[in-house]
Amino acid sequence: MKKIIYLLLLVTAFHTSCKKSSTEGGTETPTNPTTDLPAGAKDGVAFINNGTSAIVTLYAPGKTSVLLIGDFNNWSTTASIMKKTRDGNTWWIQIDNLNPSTEYAYQFYVDGKLKVADPYCEKVLDPDNDQYISAAVYPNLKAYPTGKTTGIVSVMQANQPIYTWKNNSFVRPEKNNLVIYELLIRDFTTEHTYASTLAKLDYLVNMGINAIELMPVNEFEGNLSWGYNPSFYFAADKYYGTKTALQNFIDECHGKGIAVIMDMVLNHSFGQSPMVQMYFDGSKPTANSPWFNVDAKHPFNVGYDFNHESAATKKFSKDVIKFWMQQYKIDGFRFDLSKGFTQTQSSGDDVFRKYDAGRVAIWKDYNSYIKSIDPNNFYVILEHFAEESEEKVLADDGMMLWNNLNYNMNEATMGWLTNSNFQWGFYANHGFSKSENLVSYGESHDEERLNFKNITYGNASGNYSIKGNLATSLKREELAAAFLFAIPGPKMIWQFGELGYDVNIDFNGRTGEKPIRWEYYSDPNRKALYNAYTKFIRLKKNNSIFNSTSSTYSLAGGIKYIKLVEGANTVIVVGNFDVVNQTANIDFGSSGTWVDASGTNISLNSNNYTASLAPGEYHIFSKVALR
């Protein structure tokens, strides 16, 4: 009898051990032990023992098993079983015998069926898109582990190349004096790299630009993208260059007096995100996702909508914010689709844009967190477009709001006057107490190029035609720019707007690559527009009157003017946006000599200025000569 019992025990033990030694196609998920996180652990990878060991963690509540696979265990799906914390939310493992100078590719193997990269990794390898990144753009890129795994893999390295910062005393421009240049690395130079963009930096410096707003540069899906389809938030997208190349770009900008603002997309993520993939039913996020809503809460969403009231989302977003502030020394964020940071359901913008106390609380919390990291004039810019009462609360908290003047300003440049009033550029019309909180622009990446519409749809009268006439359409751009830069507050330019870029936004698809037209700079008419921008920017930055809190204006009709008063000086910008001669009749406030920024003077016998202005003619008058 004892022999029979012993034999049964032996068979049972053998059968059990066979079940536990599953392979990648095994029949049973391995058992994961439960234990607390060790000291020094953090989300993602924490290196210890001088880089010869790493503690790797993954936040994945509700999962039954997680294994770590990678170069260090020959991608075995049985060798590195991760431990689970007692609350069941976080998985971790320590791996040893690493070479601190070696890059190791790795993934998480979740529930015996899903391989995902590390959401906190600083570099990924993409089997589909890396092949199109040249060695000139990204030297010595680690090869993808073909044949050993599938999907995007993360990369860890203890002794990463360390960038030594040179310009540590950079002082950010005051918000009111910001002249921001919105820039897409992909379409700025043919090489589409940080290095090639740096080679053009003096072009921006000479124009007077003091801030560059980079369209998204963290890892996004594919290579040829605007970047608003993010997948990995801590990894710089390799299509533009290496991590140190981006750090050097920012450092060199600081050395030239230029702040760098990063376009950050935390409203949503896309399907390559491991955070999406881990809680996904094949068509949408599942209800137990720690980060995402099953269905988007608002009508403007693309990708998968973050649940912005989730504690997990808030922690992740703050980790992303802190990382870029500290690792890359950026000077500000432009938060894409900030109005989407809501859990209030809406199906149309009439509801979506209404005052949302929950959304306000979310943004005040993030703004406070940013200030706790860097209180030194760090820029928080929102693409919000919500109800004015909500934007005022955010502005009063120190945040800056995008202000789109494209439609009305373009109507003015085309000479169609009915809807040409762009008084929305003045902060008081938003209820704001300070002009520094309103970032006004005539063009952005999202809007049609002014000069395309000038040439295609411009008005005409007699021998004066905007449509089809490049020289005239460019002068209309100059006219509008004189007014834009006279409005108090920070301003933004979309790349090549200063040269009258006139390629349709929908050419090659809205987000598709656009022709890079550096030859514009050699065209005398386009160069004249660049020179005019340079002049207007210089006037704005050198003369505090352009931030005056005392302003009057008339921006409807053909004759438009802006009047600014500061102390003993008055500036009046006047121009004719009609396509026929018009007579200006404006109260200048005093008689005597007035200085035209063109270099000539006029003398008034009374307070009134009366003059016939030709189509497109403008003047910048001041009582005291401007610098």
Report each predicted region and the residues it spans:
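Surface-exposed beta-strand/loop patches in extracellular or lumenal glycoproteins
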Residues: S53-G62, V66, F577-S591
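Aromatic- and carboxylate-lined catalytic core of secreted/periplasmic carbohydrate-active enzymes
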Residues: P488, R517-S554, P615-E617
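Aromatic-rich carbohydrate-binding modules that target alpha-glucans
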Residues: P38, F47-N50, I55-E103, D111-Y132
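C-terminal beta-strand-rich structural cap/linker in extracellular carbohydrate-active enzymes
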Residues: V66, N605-R627
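Substrate-binding/active-site clefts of carbohydrate-active enzymes
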Residues: V124-S134, Y138-A143, P161-L178, L184-G358, ...
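Bacterial Sec-dependent N-terminal signal peptides
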Residues: M1-I4, A13-V45
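Conserved alpha/beta catalytic core and glycan-binding cleft of carbohydrate-active enzymes
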Residues: K329, D356, W363-D506, K541, ...
